[in-house]
Amino acid sequence: MGPPHFVGLGAQKAGTSWWNALIHEHPLVHRAGGQPKELHFFDRAWEEPVEEADLRLYWQHFPRPEGGVAGEWTPGYLIDFWTPELIARAAPEARILVLLRDPVERLRSGITHQLATSRTPLTHRDIQGAFQRGLYAPQLRRVLAAFPAEQVLIGQYEACRADPAAELARTIEFLGLPPFEPSAGALEGAVNPTTSRKFEPSPALRRALLEGYAPDLEQLSEIIPGLDLSRWPSARELGLA
C-alpha cells in the first residue's frame, strides 16, 4: 500500500483505455480486484480542501505485492486545473502519463461518444466543452509545473496506432519496468469501439475549430520539443507541419 507508481492524466478519447490495458498486461503491474481504470478520486476536490488523510485514502487504491507496481489512468484529470498539484502532493515520485490526439479528431470522437450515450440533444455548450479539452498547452503547463519533465511522458495516439510495439516499449521503459511481450492481438485491439454514427463537424465549424486550435498547436511545439505535429491532420491543414 502506498502512493501510485504511475498516474495517467489524459487526454479523453486519445486511446487511454487501450494503452492502460496494455500497461496492465505487464506481469509486474498490479490492479486490485474490482478496481476500475478510472478512479476520478480528485474530481470533486474543488469543493473543499484536500487533507493529508484524503491523500492516504487515495493510496489505499494501490495495494500490490512486493516488487510490483500499481497506478491508475483518469483522463479527466488533465483538464481539471487543480488536479496536477494534488497528485504531486499524493505521489511526488509518480511517473505521469499523457496521451494526446489531434484536437479536432479528439473532439469528433468525444462528441460521437456523447451522442451514443446521452439522450439529451447536443448543445453549443457541449461543443465548447469538447473544444476546451483539446487546448492542450495550458493543461500541460500545469502538469510540468507540478512535476519535473523527466517524470512526465507525453505520447501521441497516432504514434501508438502507427507503431504500438515501439511506443509500448517506450512507455514500459519510462515506467522503469523490464520489457515484456503483450498477449496476441492486444497491440491492435480497440478497447472502446463504437457502432454509432460518427459526428462530423460542418465545414464552418471545422474551420472555426482549426482557427481556434492554431495558437495552441504553435505553443505545443515549444512545450514538447519532440511532438510530431505532422501526425495531426489539423496541424498539416494549418501549415504547421
Which residues make up each language-model segment?
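Generic structural signal for small/hydrophobic residues in well-ordered secondary structure
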Residues: 15-16, 58, 71, 87, ...
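ATP-dependent NMP and nucleoside kinases share a basic, alpha-helical "lid"
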Residues: 80-98, 137-138
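PAPS-dependent sulfotransferase catalytic core
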Residues: 1-74, 78, 90, 94, ...
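Short aromatic-enriched loop/helix-cap "lid" or pocket-rim segments at secondary-structure transitions
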Residues: 83-84, 108-112, 165-168
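Aromatic/hydrophobic pocket-lining residues that form the small-molecule binding cavity
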Residues: 51, 136, 213
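The conserved 3'-phosphoadenosine-5'-phosphosulfate
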Residues: 35-37, 141-222, 226-241
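Generic structural signal for well-ordered alpha-helices
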Residues: 55-59, 84, 140-141, 217
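N-terminal hydrophobic signal/anchor transmembrane helix of membrane proteins
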Residues: 91-110, 133, 190-197, 201
